[in-house]
């Protein structure tokens, strides 16, 4: 038994112990059983006794408690309690009866034993910390890559729109030049036609006047 061991863990409902596991004997078991009768329906606290800490969390009268040396700190016991809480609710739900047979929850003793060993192993704790840091860094990197790709897609959309506008502008300019030339030629032909009509009218009027004055 070392100072990194979780010595005792239990799950209780309304002050009644449903399941527990220990790796050592001592008066701490009686102390833990008295303590669970005083845990508020919803709470999170640390109770200290002779260099050891009782850590507990409770919600809706369902409490999870563990005992360990004070040198183990706060983070690891807190993670342990959150872990067994999730597994217990996953296994048994959130509705309980104080009259349920004690044996109902006996299979969870193996879960407590396994998780106590896991969180009591310093190497596992350090590995968990490293893995969490790696996972966090990986998540941040993934988010950064996704944002970069998203920005890249926006840039590509802007470039495509710019190229399309340039193309449309060129087509519009070409069409404008062609239309201008067409209108110029139509105006030219109209001017020529008007000129011819005017010349013909002048010729007709001139001939009429000459005949009137009997010049011809």
Curated annotation (Swiss-Prot):
Key words, A-Z: Coiled coil, Cytoplasmic vesicle, Endoplasmic reticulum, Endosome, Golgi apparatus, Lysosome, Membrane, Protein transport, Signal-anchor, Transmembrane, Transmembrane helix, Transport
Domain Longin: 6-112
Transmembrane regions listed in the UniProt entry: 190-210
Gene3D superfamilies, per the entry: 1.20.5.110, Longin domain
Positions in the Cytoplasmic compartment: 1-189
Primary localisation category: membrane
All copies of domain v-SNARE coiled-coil homology, residue ranges: 126-186
Membrane topology label: Single-pass type IV membrane protein
Pfam families given in the database record: Longin (PF13774), Synaptobrevin (PF00957)
Compartmental location: Cytoplasmic vesicle, Secretory vesicle membrane; Golgi apparatus, trans-Golgi network membrane; Late endosome membrane; Lysosome membrane
Signal peptide location: none
Vesicular face of the membrane: 211-216
InterPro entries for this protein: Longin-like_dom_sf (IPR011012), Longin_dom (IPR010908), Synaptobrevin-like (IPR001388), Synaptobrevin-like_transport (IPR051097), V_SNARE_CC (IPR042855)
GO CC annotation terms, alphabetical: endocytic vesicle membrane; endoplasmic reticulum membrane; endosome; Golgi apparatus; late endosome membrane; lysosomal membrane; phagocytic vesicle; phagocytic vesicle membrane
GO biological-process terms attached to the record: endosome to lysosome transport; protein transport; vesicle fusion; vesicle-mediated transport
Family the entry assigns: Belongs to the synaptobrevin family.
Oligomeric form and interacting partners: Component of the SNARE complex composed of syn7A, syn8A, vamp7A and vti1A.
Role description: Involved in the targeting and/or fusion of transport vesicles to their target membrane during transport of proteins from the early endosome to the lysosome. Required for heterotypic fusion of late endosomes with lysosomes and homotypic lysosomal fusion. Required for calcium regulated lysosomal exocytosis.
Protein name per the record: Vesicle-associated membrane protein 7A
Organism: Dictyostelium discoideum
Gene: vamp7A
């Amino acid at each position: 038994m070392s100072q990194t061991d979780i010595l005792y863990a239990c799950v209780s409902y309304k002050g009644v112990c449903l399941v527990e596991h220990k790796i050592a004997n001592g008066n701490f078991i009686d102390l833990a059983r008295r303590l669970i009768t005083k845990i508020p329906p919803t709470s999170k606290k640390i109770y200290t006794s002779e260099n050891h800490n009782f850590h507990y969390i409770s919600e809706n009268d369902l409490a999870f408690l563990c005992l360990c040396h004070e040198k183990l700190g706060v983070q690891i016991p807190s993670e342990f309690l959150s872990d067994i809480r999730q597994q217990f609710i996953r296994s048994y739900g959130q509705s309980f009866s104080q009259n349920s047979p004690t044996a109902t929850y006996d299979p969870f003793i193996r879960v407590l034993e396994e998780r106590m060993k896991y969180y009591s192993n310093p190497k596992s704790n350090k590995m968990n910390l490293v893995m969490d840091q790696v996972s966090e860094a990986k998540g941040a990197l993934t988010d950064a890559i996704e944002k970069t790709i998203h920005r890249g897609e926006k840039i590509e959309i802007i470039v495509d729109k710019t190229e399309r506008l340039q193309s449309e502008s060129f087509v519009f300019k070409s069409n404008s030049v062609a239309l201008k030339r067409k209108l110029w030629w139509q105006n030219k032909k109209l001017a020529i036609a008007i000129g011819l009509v005017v010349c013909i009218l002048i010729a007709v009027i001139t001939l009429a006047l000459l005949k009137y004055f009997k010049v011809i």
